[in-house]
Design a protein with these regions (language model features):
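Mid-domain alpha/beta scaffold segments of enzyme catalytic cores
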Residues: 1-260
Length: 260
């Protein structure tokens, strides 16, 4: 399987040895590849470098919406260069976050539009962070013209929101919160996503799935979310694992793997 969104640096990885050890733990649990995701320029540089240390690691680069206040000039130039690196497979995470008050909405929206254009320029998927901003995210995608591949990372909407995304051809990635007992509307959404548009992720070190909610998360924990989703959707674990692996390979252009 592919962990479609994780943060190896935030999990504690610092160098080739620690990256290898973390991905070894993941592979022992059936997670054969990971996409480590940036939230600022420093982590974007690290992610792009980490993806050269281990063939199982790929990178996504962007500036997180809560960190967009100082996103201009040199930072944008650096991100454009990183986005073209061959081991960088997505532009993310970008989008809108109206929960935290770290960056004004208009600043976030301008940065989001810029990332959308970058995604189209380099021909790589757009990986979206959407927190309490569903309508504005969808509106801006419509206004700007969505890239060919759009991923809603750690999807947090209900079934109605999911249906809108599905109709638009977007990919929905589910993380640990779908396993939480009170996440009924999210679980309803997860039931209706076609396999060809379904991804799974850890968003580690955050949002550890049940039964280990509240403890540190790592890519190896993806298996708990996959097992839960399989039960929720009424399919076998192997069937779901195969489906989400195929979707991830197609979205990120990873090529076929003999392992799931």
């Amino acid at each position: 399987m592919v962990d479609a969104h994780t943060h190896l640096d935030a999990c504690g990885a610092k160098d080739p040895d620690s990256v290898r050890a973390m991905v070894d733990r993941a592979e022992a649990a059936g997670v054969t590849r990971v996409v480590t995701v940036a939230d600022d320029i420093t982590s974007a540089r690290w992610a792009a470098q980490a993806a050269t240390w281990d063939e199982r690691v790929f990178a996504a680069v962007a500036v997180h919406p809560t960190r967009t206040v100082k996103f201009a000039g040199a930072a944008r130039h650096a991100l454009k260069e990183l986005a073209r690196e061959p081991r960088v497979v997505a532009i993310g995470e970008t989008g809108l976050d109206y929960y935290w008050d770290y960056s004004p909405k208009d600043v976030q929206q301008a940065a989001f539009r810029w990332h959308i254009e970058l995604s189209k320029q380099v021909g790589k998927p757009l990986m979206i962070h959407d927190r309490d901003a569903h309508d504005d995210v969808l509106s801006i995608l419509d206004e700007e013209g969505a890239p060919e591949k759009v991923i809603f990372h750690c999807f947090s909407g209900d079934a109605e929101m999911a249906a809108r995304c599905i109709d638009a051809g977007y990919f929905l990635s589910f993380a640990g919160p779908v396993t939480f007992r009170n996440a009924l509307s999210l679980q309803e959404a997860a039931r209706i996503v076609p396999e060809r548009q379904l991804l799974v992720e850890t968003d580690a070190p955050f949002l550890t799935p049940q039964p280990y909610r509240g403890r540190p998360n790592e890519p190896y924990c993806l298996a708990y979310t996959v097992r839960y989703l399989a039960e929720l959707r009424g399919v076998s674990v192997s069937e779901l694992a195969s489906a989400v692996n195929a979707t991830a390979e197609r979205v990120f252009g990873l090529g076929h793997s003999e392992q799931s």
